[in-house]
Amino acid sequence: MTTVTRSSSANLGASQKLAVKKGDAMMSSKGISNRSNRSALGDIGNKVSNMTIDPTKKALGLPVIKKEIIQKSKFTRSKTTVSESDILLQEKESACCSRAYTIFKDAIEPIVSTVDLMDISEDKPDAFSKVLLTVEDIDANDKDNPQLVSDYVNDIYHYMRHLEETFAVKANFLEGQEVTGKMRSILIDWLCQVHHRFHLLQETLYLTVSIIDRFLQVHPISRNKLQLVGVTSMLLASKYEEMYAPEVADFVYITDNAYTKADIRTMEQTILKTLDFSFGKPLCLHFLRRNSKAGQVDATKHTLAKYLMELTIIEYDMVHCNPSIIAAAALCLSMKVLDDSQWSETLAHYSNYSEKEIYPVMQKLAQLVVKAETSKLTAVKIKYSSSRFMKISSIPELKSNAITDLVL
């Protein structure tokens, strides 16, 4: 058998080329004898190999340090050549670092500005309102009752005033529709009777009227569907406010079977979609309770204010008034009528209205009191003439000069 082998010089040439390509150091083999000698140093290899060791000489007593040679694996070898992509990456990183340093340097550099001297002259206005010194903290004694949320109550009422602007009803919103303001007043008067017969909460009635007005403002209907909208709105308000809401069959009965259960359910879906399932508009009662607490009024003044507020839900010309200003005007007029109490700074602070701001609404309320004596829409007046409501609609003070002076 013939064996084919490469020469040593051929193997050496290939190894040198590979070493140059990979950038590793080449070590010469002992078996290579035909390597050319360097003229400047002579044949170092022969001199080393021809050296003789004298056994009579002792070796120096120096410690022998052996250098551990770690052989590189294919995973630890790295190329010494740098590609163009690596250079571009290094340049980008350098640019980013430089830019970040510039931004950081600008951020920490102090801004030098001139500071004006404080004017401490006596003719300048105070830095705080002196009015707050006379305002009583009506929530100071409620901190031990977590249900009264005294820490958040001011923020809650601030948010409620924002909501009443969000869900506001425009004045004369029925203009151009088949349903008129008079038809609306008749419907609300009838719903007051239904509400009283079902023994529902006071909030349910106010929410019913709110749903009706908001729905009719954006969804015109025919007059033969107006009563359907009314009973469906009361059904929705009952589900929202009551613990035990009346059934659909109860509203079918109260309308003398003018509408079916399917009609009420269909209208319920229409109202929900139109109002986007939003029934969070604040009510007059919410603000009245807060104002009555701030004014420390008795039950008679509070009940008279409720009567005045309920007169406004029938009046079409007052649909655009916010619940907060109606509640403030009703309580202020109640205080004026019963004992001529003053609208204090505490009441102005917590109601967010001064007496001057609510005066036009007080005039309108006085007109409604006079109008209720001769109006055919008597549901509210009859309701508040019962002993349950202290017969407040029949008190002689409602015919006093405090009312008549505001009407003129």
Curated annotation (Swiss-Prot):
A molecular function GO annotation: cyclin-dependent protein serine/threonine kinase regulator activity
Q: Which InterPro entries match?
A: Cyclin (IPR039361), Cyclin-like_dom (IPR013763), Cyclin-like_sf (IPR036915), Cyclin_A/B-like (IPR046965), Cyclin_C-dom (IPR004367), Cyclin_N (IPR006671), Cyclins_cyclin-box (IPR048258)
> Per its UniProt entry, which superkingdom is the organism in?
Eukaryota
The cross-references to PROSITE patterns, in alphabetical order and at most eight, read: CYCLINS (PS00292)
Q: Which UniProt keywords apply?
A: Cell cycle, Cell division, Cyclin, Mitosis
Report whether Cell division shows up as a keyword of the record: yes
A biological process term (GO) from this entry: cell division
The entry assigns this protein to a family as follows: Belongs to the cyclin family. Cyclin AB subfamily.
Q: How does it assemble?
A: Interacts with the CDC2 protein kinase to form a serine/threonine kinase holoenzyme complex also known as maturation promoting factor (MPF). The cyclin subunit imparts substrate specificity to the complex.
**What is the name of the protein in this document?**
G2/mitotic-specific cyclin-B
Species of origin: Patella vulgata
